Amino acid sequence: SPPFAPRL
């Protein structure tokens, strides 16, 4: 996932 997207 992109670095600016939160990891859930």
UniProtKB/Swiss-Prot annotation:
Domain of life where this protein originates: Eukaryota
Record keywords: Amidation, Neuropeptide, Secreted
PTM-bearing positions, type Leucine amide: L8
Modification after translation (UniProt): Position 8 could be leucine amide or isoleucine amide.
Cellular compartments per GO CC: extracellular region
GO BP, one annotated term: neuropeptide signaling pathway
Localization of this protein: Secreted
Primary role: Mediates visceral muscle contractile activity (myotropic activity).
Family: Belongs to the pyrokinin family.
Protein name: Pyrokinin
Organism name: Rhodnius prolixus
